[in-house]
Amino acid sequence: MRHLTLALDIMGGDNGPHIILSAALKALNEFPHLNLIFCGDEDVITSWLNQHSSSLSNRYSIVHCNQQVLMDDNPVKALRHKKDSSMACAIKHVHNEQADACVSAGNTGALLAMACSQLKTLSGVNRPALVSSLPTAKGHKVYLLDLGATVQSDAQTLLQNAVMGSVLAEQIAGIERPRVAILNVGEEQIKGPANIKEASQLLAASDHLNYIGFVEGDDIFNDIADVIVTDGFSGNIALKSCEGLVKLLIEQVKRDAKRNILSKIMAKLAMPLLRRLYLRVNPDQYNGASLIGLRGIVVKSHGNASDEAFLYAIREAVQEAERQVPTKIKDKIENLLMERS
C-alpha cells in the first residue's frame, strides 16, 4: 500500500484545534501508511502535541500560518485577503502535489472559493459539488449531491453530478452500476421544473448511468437509489432537515427515558436495541462531505464535529486518495463527452 499524505486545516471549525489534532493522532494510529501536514498556528499546535504525542512525531509536520478563516468571513474576502490562512495552506499543499488530499472543518463558502481558485475543476465539469452519504433502511448508504456548492443547477450540471456521484458510489461503497435518481416533487415525468425534466432525459439517454427516474424526499432513506441528484438549494435543505430530525429523535429518547421510574426501566431493557439504532444513524459516521469535480481531493467536515466525527472525515479523504477518485471521475466525464459528441 502506497504512502499517503493529508493536509489538515487545524484552525478550522467551532471547537478548537485540539479536536482536529486528537482526530489526527487517532488517524495516524489507524493508518500506518499515512503522514499528515498540520497547517495552522505553530505555537498552538506544538503546545498541544507536546502533551499528547511522542512516538508519532516522525509522521507529521507543521506549517505555520499567520491567518485563520473565521466562520463568518465573507468567502470572496477570505479568498483575496487570507492567502496565509490554515485553510489556504492545506489546499495549496494539494495543488502543489505535496498532499494527496486536504480536510477542513472551516467556513464552507471560503473552502469552496479557495478550492476552486487553486485546484480548478476537472475538464468537462462546470461546477464542483458537495456530496455526502446517508444511511438507508437496509443498512446501506445513499449518496446525496449537491449539498450546497451550487444553489441552482442546470440540466448539464445535474448530469455531471450524476456521473460524479456514481463514480463515488462505485469507488468508495463498492457498488456496481449504482442506481441513480433525481430528487423531485413527484415520481411522474410530467412533474418538476424544466431543468429537472431536461436532466431526466439526459440521464436516461446515457449508457454510463443506471438511471431509475425521479424519487421524492421520503424515498431518500428507503434504499431505492444509491445516488440521488439535486441542486444545492434543495440538497442542503434536505441534509439539514435529516440532521435535525436525528438530533430530535435522540434527544426525545433521552428525555422520555428520564420521565419516571417505569420509563427508566423500559429504557434500560431497550438499551441494546437503541444502541444498535444509534450506531446506524449516528451523524458522526456520516461526517465528511466531499467537494468533488476538482483536480484534487477536498473533504469538508462539520464545523462542530467531535474528534470522532473529524476522524470519519479523514477516513473519507484516505479512501478517496487510495482509490484516486478525481482520476476516475475525469475518465468517466471524458467517456460521457465522447458519448454525446
Curated annotation (Swiss-Prot):
Key word Ion transport present: no
Molecular function terms, GO-annotated: phosphate:acyl-[acyl carrier protein] acyltransferase activity
Keyword Lipid biosynthesis in record: yes
Role played: Catalyzes the reversible formation of acyl-phosphate (acyl-PO(4)) from acyl-[acyl-carrier-protein] (acyl-ACP). This enzyme utilizes acyl-ACP as fatty acyl donor, but not acyl-CoA.
GO cellular component: cytoplasm
Recorded metabolic or biological pathway in which this protein acts: Lipid metabolism; phospholipid metabolism
UniProt xrefs under InterPro entries: FA_synthesis, Phospholipid_synth_PlsX-like
Keywords from the UniProt entry: Cytoplasm, Lipid biosynthesis, Lipid metabolism, Phospholipid biosynthesis, Phospholipid metabolism, Transferase
Major enzyme class: transferase
Protein name in the entry: Phosphate acyltransferase
Localization per Swiss-Prot or TrEMBL: Cytoplasm
Enzyme Commission number(s) of this protein: 2.3.1.274
Cross-referenced SUPFAM superfamilies: Isocitrate/Isopropylmalate dehydrogenase-like
GO annotation, biological process: fatty acid biosynthetic process; phospholipid biosynthetic process
Top-rank taxon, per record: Bacteria
Catalytic reaction equation(s): a fatty acyl-[ACP] + phosphate = an acyl phosphate + holo-[ACP]
Subunit structure, interactors included: Homodimer. Probably interacts with PlsY.
